[in-house]
């Protein structure tokens, strides 16, 4: 084995190794999820060298510099103040979703007007209108980290694959018999998965446009789906109160997670794929061991339905958003609530951590988005100006831009 190059991954912090083995170029990653601005660099580099034979003494200085750069990134933008940069009268009907590419250079908006639009983040200019769907464009995504393709899922029962650069439609995936409400690319960007009101999920080959496999077994609509970090497994959450873990290559059921007593609103893996988090209309979140499929904790405290939930990149913190107008942060190890985020005057439908993991973004029916301090629960900023509920909000990869999308037909860029 011969090390060819070292590359940085900023969020979550890690060093990617490109090496040659048997004439083939391979990659692996050293995940530094515990890294903080106060970590002792020399100690950490010593630990890395103990476990990674490719990092020899001659590479010590280089690795030390890379770790220091990662620490700088964790300090950057972590206390950013956001100001309104642009209001985009994006669509003639309400927006359904917004999504950014990894570079943050452009973002997309889906709408009830049957289109998806591609926007330049720096200028707020419209780059493309993706037309062709015959009903609401509901689910949208970039194939991050690459960002050169866009998938759109529609109430017209089809999913379309587009070029992010030219706006050209590559494929229309047909096969669902009801509305498509969620979708996701696998991390390798070889497959797109769609979840539908027809109770199935389907995986589609991006190159050929062919259906790879259909995931059948749910008894009601699939409302949420996501891949694990490796792309080997996919998880689906349904209105039948269950979550199913599937083998992404064969479509075989690996686990059925039974325990919630109402519809599932969100289901996702932690970054290291060891835990699964599920949120439900039964007012609870449940934490599951991803290997055994056993429930390890039920997170309680909300007085109404949980509408969204997420992990931070370390997998140590969990955030939940509820129809009770509050959000909560839980410690994933102790399963205790650390902070309660209070201030919204309506239900919170979206929540996400910034890439640095020290801020939370929430979007609410009270027409505002808010930025919160994760540790104290203090509201740091209220992003005001929308005239109707906020459906969707997101940080860019650096954490210094926020996009909000609203029922008022507009989206706003904050930076």
Curated annotation (Swiss-Prot):
GO terms for cellular component: ciliary basal body; cilium; cytoplasm; extracellular region; motile cilium; SCF ubiquitin ligase complex. Its main location: cytoplasm. WD repeats lie at residues 90-129, 132-174, 175-214, 217-256, 259-298, 301-340, 343-384, 386-415. Keywords: Cell projection, Cilium, Cytoplasm, Cytoskeleton, Flagellum, Repeat, WD repeat. InterPro entries: G-protein_beta_WD-40_rep, WD40/YVTN_repeat-like_dom_sf, WD40_repeat_CS, WD40_repeat_dom_sf, WD40_rpt. GO terms for biological process: cerebrospinal fluid circulation; determination of left/right symmetry; epithelial cilium movement involved in extracellular fluid movement; establishment of localization in cell; heart development; intraciliary transport; outer dynein arm assembly; protein polyubiquitination. SMART domains: WD40. Gene3D superfamilies: YVTN repeat-like/Quinoprotein amine dehydrogenase. It is found in: Cytoplasm, Cytoskeleton, Flagellum basal body; Cytoplasm, Cytoskeleton, Flagellum axoneme. GO terms for molecular function: ubiquitin-like ligase-substrate adaptor activity. Required for axonemal dynein assembly and ciliary motility in ciliated organs, including Kupffer's vesicle, during embryogenesis. Facilitates the onset of robust cilia motility during development. Interacts with IFT46. Belongs to the WD repeat WDR69 family. This is Dynein assembly factor with WD repeat domains 1. The lineage of its organism: Eukaryota, Metazoa, Chordata, Craniata, Vertebrata.
């Amino acid at each position: 084995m011969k090390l060819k190059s070292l590359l940085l991954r900023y969020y979550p912090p890690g060093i990617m190794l490109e090496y040659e083995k048997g004439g083939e170029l391979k990659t692996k990653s050293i995940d530094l999820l515990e890294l903080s601005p106060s970590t002792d660099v020399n100690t950490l580099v010593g630990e890395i060298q103990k476990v990674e034979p490719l990092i020899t003494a001659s590479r010590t200085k280089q690795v030390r510099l890379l770790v220091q750069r990662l620490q700088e990134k964790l300090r950057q933008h972590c206390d950013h103040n956001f100001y309104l940069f642009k209001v985009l009268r994006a669509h003639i009907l309400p927006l359904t979703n917004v999504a950014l590419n990894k570079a943050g250079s452009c973002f997309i908006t889906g709408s009830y007007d049957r289109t998806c639009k591609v926007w330049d983040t720096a200028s707020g200019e419209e780059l493309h209108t993706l037309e062709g769907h015959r009903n609401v464009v509901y689910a949208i995504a970039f194939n991050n980290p690459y960002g050169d393709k866009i998938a759109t899922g529609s109430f017209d029962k089809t999913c379309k694959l587009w070029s992010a650069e030219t706006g050209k439609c590559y494929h229309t995936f047909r096969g669902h018999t009801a509305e498509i409400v969620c979708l996701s690319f696998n991390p390798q960007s070889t497959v797109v998965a769609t979840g539908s009101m027809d109770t199935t999920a389907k995986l589609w080959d991006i190159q050929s446009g062919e259906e790879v496999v259909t995931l059948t077994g749910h008894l009601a609509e699939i409302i949420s789906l996501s891949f694990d970090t490796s792309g080997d497994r996919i998880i689906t959450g349904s209105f039948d109160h269950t979550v199913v873990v599937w083998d992404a290559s064969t479509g075989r059921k690996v686990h059925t997670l039974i325990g919630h007593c109402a519809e599932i609103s969100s289901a996702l893996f932690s970054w290291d794929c060891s835990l699964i988090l599920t949120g439900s209309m039964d007012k609870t979140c449940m934490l599951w061991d991803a290997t055994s499929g056993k429930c390890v904790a039920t997170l309680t405290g909300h007085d109404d339905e949980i509408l969204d939930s997420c992990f931070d990149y370390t997998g140590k913190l969990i955030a939940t958003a509820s129809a009770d107008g509050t959000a909560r942060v839980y410690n994933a190890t102790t399963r205790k609530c650390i902070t309660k985020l209070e201030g919204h005057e309506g239900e919170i439908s979206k929540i996400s951590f910034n890439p640095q993991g020290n801020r939370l973004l929430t979007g609410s029916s009270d027409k505002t988005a808010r930025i919160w301090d994760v540790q104290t629960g203090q509201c740091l900023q209220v992003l005001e100006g929308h005239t109707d509920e906020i459906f969707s909000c997101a940080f860019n990869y650096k954490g210094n831009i926020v996009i909000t999308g609203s029922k008022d037909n507009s989206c706003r860029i904050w930076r």
